[in-house]
Amino acid sequence: MMTIAQIMEKMIAFSEGNVHDITHLSCVWTYAKTIGELEGLDADTQFILEVAAITHDIACPLCRKKYGNTNGKYQEQEGAPLVREFLADTGMTAVQIDRVAYLVGHHHSPAQIDGIDYQILIEADYIVNASESGYDQQAIRTFMEHTMKTAAGIRLTKTVFGV
């Protein structure tokens, strides 16, 4: 089976030199990995989380070409089938690929969170999006209070944004 590093390298190549996309996925992966480890995830859940974090925006290049934007709904719609194809030769099990595809296909739908891997992916992506887009303190505080559930995600958010 491919390692996380090999999947990361493959995703960087897939990103075709888009430095913003590569930096974003790298940052989301870093936060997801950190939160997952601090929360004590089992090895398989941690692996699935990290693969999902690396590939969560896999549909962005296609969405830019097809729709002219990277709207979250389009990302979810296009991302699940793309990630299945992307992961087909990694040696991951069908169950692992199914879960990653589910996470990628729902990563803009926090109301549907159904597991710790999904929760952490949402938290990690939010931290990075808030940083990249300069979300105001109140928006960050509101998200933290209403959507964040992990102690590690809340601690990191408080530390990063001073809320």
PLM regions: where:
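Short alpha-helical hairpin
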Residues: M1-K10, A53-A59
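Mid-chain, well-packed structural core segment of small domains
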Residues: F86-M92, D98-H106
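An active-site-proximal "capping" alpha-helix that borders the catalytic cofactor pocket
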Residues: V28-Y31, K73-D89
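Divalent metal-dependent phosphate-bond-processing catalytic cores, especially two-metal-ion Mg2+/Mn2+ enzymes
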Residues: M2, A13-S26, T30-D42, T55, ...
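Membrane-helix interface segments
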Residues: A43-T45, Q96
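Active-site metal-coordination segments of metallo-dependent hydrolases
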Residues: E16-C27, K65-E78
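His-Asp-centered metal-binding catalytic motifs of divalent-metal-dependent phosphohydrolases/nucleases
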Residues: Q46-G68, G79, A101-H108, D125
